[in-house]
Amino acid sequence: MKIENVEYKVIEDKRVVVASIRGISFDAINVFNNRFLAHATSHLDLVSAWDDQKFMMPYSMKAVARCIPDDEFSVEKGKQIALKKLSEKYNRSLDRHLMHIANAMKKCLDNMDVYFTKHKMI
C-alpha cells in the first residue's frame, strides 16, 4: 500500500478520523506479477491468464479511529491509528488474495505435471 495514496477525513465534532484508499483492485495481481512472475518468465501476465474475481482486491478500503470520551482528541494521533488499522486491513486482504493466486497456480502446475507424466515428457 502506498502511504501517499491514503486520504484522511477528520470529523472533529464526532472525534473521528477516517483513513481511506482507492484504486487497489489489482494490487494483489500486481504484487504477484512483479514479485514472482517477473523473475521466472518474460511476459506472463496473470490478468490475461485468468479472469477471476477472487484475485481482485476491493476497489477501496477504509479504517476508522474513534476517540473515546475520556481522551483528548488529536488529529495526528487519530491519523496514526487510522493508518495503522488501514494498513493491517490492507495487508490481510493482500495476503488472502495472494493465497488465492498461489492456490490457482498450484492447481495449474499440478495439471501440467499430470499432462507431462501422461505424455511421458518427464
Describe each region flagged by the PLM.
Residues 1-122:
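Catalytic phosphate/metal-binding cores of nucleic-acid and nucleotide-processing enzymes, i.e., regions
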